[in-house]
Amino acid sequence: MTYCLALKVNRGLVFASDSRTNAGVDYVATYSKMRRYCWPGERVCVLMTSGSLATSQAVMNAINRDLNDPDAEFSLRHGKQLYEVAQYIGKLSQAEQTLHEKAMEKSNASAESNFILGGQIAGQAAEIFHIYPQGNFISASEDTPYLQIGETKYGKPILDRIIAKTTTLEDAARCAMVSLDSTIRSNISVGPPIELAMYQDDSLDEPFHHTYTLNSPMYKSMKKQWTDGLHRAFEQLPRFDWEKVKADEPAGE
């Protein structure tokens, strides 16, 4: 299992992912789920994956093959709109799944992968897309300016409470970190290092990128402050009516 998310706010895009792969309790490994492609002044693409690692790697290999082939029919550099790039990735994923479909069915395994694509092409607005295993895709909406893939449920509540179009890029990044940390605490199949990338609208340059381990000072401080803050907020919640009555009763002799 994995967890990746992308947020779209007025000033830009935020991407975050864990780095754990899990093929059972006896085989847990670390693998980056985020790829960044940048042609300064022209376009920026960030791609994250969840699901079948074999399918994800095959799609990444096909992307790199087409980028290195001047005669390729399409590549990340060809699309005039980012949704055309999303269509291209969806087709690559579908082709890879179809190639191994019968063998996977016999072993009762799944070759499905989900992708999040985000970035910007010169002259166009920055966008994020969730590309499904079936090859179709959706974009983030005004009301829900984020996308998630993988183990999504534990990290969703904080996004719903905090993220809006007007959220600053830095606050969106902090929220993404908390969302990932909440998931890591609740699901053993999601784990650090955490990769974080931030892209500023219209910069058309390499996104800021950093990797945080369990021992990274910023991550350790964030975890502690968030946990302490939750405890303080919980302790300050309103009392039930019967607690108030009990508190007002005179102490017995």
Whereabouts are the PLM-identified features?
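N-terminal nucleophile
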Residues: 1-253
